[in-house]
Amino acid sequence: MSIPQIRTEAIEAVGRKILMEYDPSLLSGQPCPVPIETIIETKFDLILEFHTLRKNPKILGETIFDDGAVVLYDQIQRQYRMIAVRAGTILIDERLCDPSKLGRLRFTCAHELAHWVLHKKLYSGTGDVAAYNGNVSSDESHGIIERQADTLASALLMPLPQIKKCFYRIRIGRTDEQLIAEMANI
């Protein structure tokens, strides 16, 4: 698998372009939470589903590039089962829906969207899925792919123009932690 080398600045530009096309006020208006789930489902026409992905919650999300089947854990039956999935499906571990994990949920959604945007050509036709476990991989090529997805996820959820606005507000003496919490939707 040939890993595309993408500069951080280019990935951040992709994030700004996505937000600009979806709603320019996310870059220039009042800082607010980026509606990542809505962007996934409306701008990209992807399917967002919530399931228990594994018995051990190490895998937080998966992006499906080809029609096929995936293995999920059934907590009621206490066994793994297969379900059919379509290309363009993002699977998120439903345990992230706990209110205390909202930040991780939003980041995982953005991370999986980033795989779709940045790595679709890399994975399509291979039968592989991009899976996120929240850790840096020891496999160098996998680590590069995950860092790229992390970078785009960050650019989407924390657009630089809005971060700068918040920084300057705080810098001039306003230490409003609530503003930061509201912007991050946590």
What positions do the PLM features span?
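Active-site hotspot residues in diverse enzymes, especially metal/ion-binding acidic/histidine motifs
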Residues: 1-186
